[in-house]
Curated annotation (Swiss-Prot):
The modification Leucine amide is found at L81. Residues 22-48 form a propeptide. It comes from Cyriopagopus hainanus. GO terms for cellular component: extracellular region; host cell presynaptic membrane. Keywords: Amidation, Disulfide bond, Ion channel impairing toxin, Knottin, Neurotoxin, Presynaptic neurotoxin, Secreted, Signal, Toxin, Voltage-gated sodium channel impairing toxin. InterPro entries: Huwentoxin-1, Huwentoxin_CS1. This is Hainantoxin-III 2. Pfam families: Toxin_12.
Length: 83
């Protein structure tokens, strides 16, 4: 059962990569794909002035980013729904 799930997942990933490659007009597809995959690492070095979703915070202080609020119960930034 596990093997068939992994095989199906690998097939979907392969289908996605082949579909993306067929639509790509550039010759440097592997390098472009890898740079897009690992581009997330560039954002880790940046510091924000506010805390994002799931970051610990102190209730009463305005530490969370816009659209987030510090939960007094859990003491981490949650999405503010206006309640």
């Amino acid at each position: 059962m596990k093997a068939s799930m992994y095989l199906a997942l690998a097939g979907l990933v392969l289908l996605f990569v082949v579909g993306y490659a067929s639509e790509s007009e550039e010759k440097e597809f592997p390098r472009e794909l890898l740079s897009k995959i690992f581009a997330v690492d560039d954002f880790k070095g940046e510091e924000r002035g506010c805390k994002g979703f799931g970051d610990s915070c102190t209730p009463g202080k305005n530490e969370c980013c816009p659209n987030y609020a510090c939960s007094s119960k859990h003491k981490w930034c949650k999405v503010y729904l206006g309640k």
